[in-house]
Swiss-Prot record:
Residues 283-601 form the Protein kinase domain. Disulfide bonds join 48-110, 55-171, 108-169. It holds the Pfam family LysM1_NFP_LYK. Residues 119-165, 186-231 form the LysM domain. Belongs to the protein kinase superfamily. Ser/Thr protein kinase family. Chitin binds at residues 125-131, 154-160. GO terms for biological process: cellular response to chitin; cellular response to molecule of bacterial origin; innate immune response. The gene is LYK4. The keyword tRNA processing does not apply. The lineage of its organism: Eukaryota, Viridiplantae, Streptophyta, Embryophyta, Tracheophyta. Disruption phenotype: Reduced induction of chitin-responsive genes and diminished chitin-induced cytosolic calcium elevation, accompanied by an enhanced susceptibility to both the bacterial pathogen Pseudomonas syringae pv. tomato DC3000 and the fungal pathogen Alternaria brassicicola. It comes from the Eukaryota. Residues 23-275 are extracellular. This is LysM domain receptor-like kinase 4. It comes from Arabidopsis thaliana. The active site is at 467 (proton acceptor).
Length: 612
C-alpha cells in the first residue's frame, strides 16, 4: 500500500510539473555573439514548447532608410502588404519615418526543437550573417540560426544569393493560455534606454506578465540592446505609434517571509497537512484531465463515424442536402483559423461579383471582384473545403497566394483570396504580346521555386502541391509570383507515400506518379521543370511534352526559345534536365533549385546591365 501511494504521489508530481512548463528564458547578449554555439542559450531560437506547434505571432521592426515603406518592409518579411497596412493604420503607399515601430504579422512554427518563422532574403554586397541578423533584421535572428538553417558559412555568401532567415518567435504555452489568457507572443528587439517596465507600458501589458513570459524577475530584469524579449498579448497588437503609454505601475511590494513556528511539532503537523492537500489537489487535477480526455475521445469517435458515413455517401454519389443552418462549417476549422480569417456573407460576394456574372468570371469556378474597395479572387468549391482552408490559414509566405476569408452557402464553399492583379502566369508566357523581360521571367521562376521550397521544408507539416502548372501561378502588381490552387496539396512527413487517386494537369505529372501513384516532393520538382521550360520558351506544356516524347533534346528546345542569351542556355538546360529526370531520386530538391536560380538570375542581371 505504501509502495502504491509513493508511486501515485510521484506520478501526480510528474503530471503537475507539465503544467509548470517553462516559458522562454531571456538569455541576454548571448544571442548577439556569433562565437556562442551552445544551444542551451537559445541562440538558434526560442524553444518549441507552445501548446500549438503553429500559431499567429508578431514582431516589431523599426523602419530604416532601406526599409521605410509598407511595400519594402512587407517584402523583407515575406508577408502580404495589406496585413501590414491594416495592423499599422497605414495606406499601402505609406512611408514611415526612420525609427518608427512597425508591427509585422508572422506564422510561427516548430522546426525541430526551435520555434521560428522562415523568410527568404537576397544577399547584398558586404553582407554577413552578423550584419543580416543584427543590422538588417535588428536582432530578430542570430548568426547561429542563419548558419544552421542554410548550411553555408558566412564567408561563402555572395550578392544575389537567396537564403532562408529564421525569425525568432514563439507560441504561448498551455500555462500562459490557461492562467493568463495569452493568445499571442510578440518578439520585440530591445533598444538603448529600454526597460521591461517601459516596454510593457508601451504595449499595455503588466510588467509582471512580461517578466514571467521571459523567465525574469523584478530583481533580475536587466535587458540589453539587439536582444529580443517576448511580449504576451491577449489581443492582436494595436498601432504602437498611436498608443498613449499608461502610468508606470507601482513598485513591487516586498513580501515578508512568514514567521517561524515556535513549536516544531506544529510546523511538522502543518507540513503533513500541506502534503496531504497537495496529493488531494493533484488527484483532483488528474480526475479533471481524465474526464476531459474521455470526453474528447468520445467526440473524436463520433466525428470519425460521421466522416466514414460522409465518405460512403460520397462514394455512392450521394450529396445530402445542406443548409447554412443544418451544417456549421466552423466545426471543421481550427480555432486559430476562425480568428484569423473573415467569414463573409453570401450577399457580400454576390455584390462583389455582380451576382457571379460572366463578366467577373476568370474561367472555371473562379471570379474576380471588389470587396470594400479591395480586389479579391473568389473560388467556388463544391463539397467540403475545410481541409484546404485549414492548410491555407497556416501558410504565410510572399510566394503563396493568401486566403483572406471564406463563405459557406447552400452546401458550397466560396474561398476569398488576395487579388493578383496581373492574373495567371500562363496569360503572360503563352501569348505573343508578352512584355516580360528575361530578368522578370527568371525572377518569377525563382519565386515559384522559393514558394515550393517553403511548402516542402518549412511548412508544418510539409506539403506537396501535386498540381503545379502555369495556370496555378499568379502574378501581382510587381510581377512577383504567388502559387495558388492548393486544393490538391497533401501533407507528408515521409520521403514518399502511395496513392490510388492520381490527379493533376496533363503534361505536368511525373512518371512515377502516373505509373505507380508515388507522391513525394520530387513530384513538384518535375512540374517545376515543365513550368520553367514554359517560362523560357513561351510554349505550352502539351506542346513541350510532344516535343520531348518525339526525342527532341532540351537544348534544342531552348535554342528556339525566346530571349535566352547563349551564355546562359547551358545553365538553364542543366536545371531543366535535372528536374525532368525520369528517376525521381535523381532530381534536385527545391532548395537546390532556389540556389541554382539565384545564381542564374544574378548572372542575367549582370548580362542585361552590361548590354546597355
Amino acid at each position: 500500500m505504501i509502495s502504491f501511494s509513493f508511486h501515485l504521489l510521484v506520478f501526480i508530481l510528474l503530471s503537475l510539473s507539465s503544467f509548470a512548463t517553462a516559458q522562454q528564458p531571456y538569455v541576454g547578449i548571448s544571442t548577439t555573439d556569433c562565437s556562442v554555439s551552445d544551444n542551451t542559450t537559445s541562440v538558434f531560437g526560442y524553444s518549441c514548447n507552445g501548446l500549438n506547434k503553429t500559431c499567429q505571432a508578431y514582431v516589431i521592426f523599426r523602419s530604416t532608410p532601406s526599409f521605410s515603406t509598407v511595400t519594402s518592409i512587407s517584402s523583407l518579411f515575406s508577408v502580404d502588404p495589406s496585413l501590414v497596412s491594416s495592423l499599422n493604420d497605414a495606406s499601402p503607399s505609406t512611408s514611415f519615418p526612420s525609427g518608427q515601430q512597425v508591427i509585422i504579422p508572422l506564422t510561427c512554427s516548430c522546426t525541430g526543437d526551435d520555434s521560428q518563422s522562415n523568410i527568404t532574403y537576397t544577399i547584398q554586397p558586404n553582407d554577413s550573417y552578423f550584419a543580416i541578423a543584427n543590422d538588417t533584421l535588428q536582432g530578430l535572428s542570430t548568426c547561429q540560426a542563419l548558419a544552421k538553417q542554410n548550411n553555408v558559412s558566412s564567408q561563402s555568401l555572395f550578392p544575389g544569393m537567396r537564403i532562408v532567415v529564421p525569425i525568432r518567435c514563439a507560441c504561448p504555452t498551455a500555462k500562459q493560455i490557461n492562467e493568463d489568457g495569452v493568445k499571442y507572443l510578440m518578439s520585440y528587439t530591445v533598444v538603448f534606454e529600454d526597460t521591461i517596465a517601459i516596454i510593457s507600458d508601451r504595449f499595455g501589458v503588466e510588467t509582471s506578465k512580461t517578466l514571467k513570459a521571459n523567465e525574469m524577475s523584478f530583481e533580475n530584469s536587466e535587458v540589453f540592446p539587439f536582444t529580443t524579449i517576448l511580449i504576451p498579448l491577449v489581443n492582436p497588437p494595436a498601432n504602437t505609434n498611436s498608443l498613449i503609454p499608461p502610468p508606470p505601475p507601482p513598485p513591487p511590494q516586498s513580501v515578508s517571509p512568514p514567521p517561524l513556528s515556535p513549536d516544531g511539532r506544529k510546523s511538522k503537523k502543518k507540513t503533513w497537512v500541506y502534503a496531504l492537500a497537495g496529493v488531494l489537489g493533484g488527484a483532483l487535477v488528474l480526475s479533471v484531465i481524465g474526464a476531459a480526455i474521455f470526453c474528447l475521445s468520445k467526440k473524436k469517435t463520433k466525428t470519425q463515424t460521421q466522416e466514414e458515413t460522409g465518405n460512403l455517401d460520397s462514394f455512392m454519389g450521394k450529396k445530402p442536402p445542406m443548409s447554412d443552418q443544418e451544417f456549421d462549417p466552423l466545426d471543421g476549422l481550427s480555432g486559430m483559423v476562425v480568428e484569423s480569417l473573415k467569414v463573409y456573407k453570401f450577399h457580400e460576394l454576390q455584390s462583389a461579383t455582380s451576382d457571379f456574372t460572366s463578366s467577373s468570371s476568370i474561367g472555371g469556378s473562379g471570379y474576380i471582384g471588389k470587396i470594400n474597395g479591395d480586389g479579391a479572387m473568389i473560388k467556388k468549391i463544391e463539397g467540403n473545403a475545410s481541409e484546404e482552408v485549414n492548410l491555407l490559414s497556416k501558410l504565410n509566405h510572399l510566394n503563396i497566394i493568401r486566403l483572406s476569408g471564406f463563405c459557406f452557402h447552400e452546401g458550397d464553399w466560396y474561398l476569398v483570396y488576395e487579388h493578383a492583379s496581373n492574373g495567371s502566369l500562363s496569360e503572360w508566357i503563352h501569348t505573343t504580346k508578352s512584355l516580360l523581360s528575361l530578368t522578370q521571367k527568371l525572377q518569377i521562376a525563382l519565386d515559384i521555386a522559393t514558394g515550393l521550397n517553403y511548402l516542402h521544408n518549412f511548412a508544418d507539416p510539409p506539403y506537396v502541391h501535386r498540381d503545379l502548372n502555369s495556370n496555378n501561378v499568379f502574378l501581382d502588381l510587381e510581377f512577383r509570383a504567388k502559387i495558388g490552387s492548393l486544393g490538391s496539396a497533401r501533407s507528408t512527413t515521409e520521403d514518399f507515400v502511395l496513392t490510388k487517386h492520381v490527379e493533376g494537369t496533363r503534361g505536368y505529372l511525373a512518371p512515377e506518379y502516373l505509373e505507380h501513384g508515388l507522391v513525394s516532393t520530387k513530384l513538384d520538382v518535375y512540374a517545376f521543370g515543365v513550368v520553367l521550360l514554359e517560362i523560357v520558351t513561351g510554349k505550352e506544356a502539351s506542346e513541350l511534352k510532344k516535343e520531348i516524347d518525339e526525342g527532341k533534346a532540351i537544348d534544342e528546345i531552348l535554342i528556339h526559345g525566346r530571349l535566352l542569351p547563349e551564355g546562359l542556355t547551358s545553365f538553364v538546360e542543366r536545371l531543366v534536365v535535372d528536374c525532368l529526370k525520369k528517376d525521381h531520386l535523381n532530381r534536385p530538391s527545391m532548395d537546390e533549385n532556389v540556389m541554382s536560380l539565384s545564381k542564374i538570375l544574378a548572372a542575367t542581371q549582370n548580362w542585361e546591365e552590361s548590354s546597355y
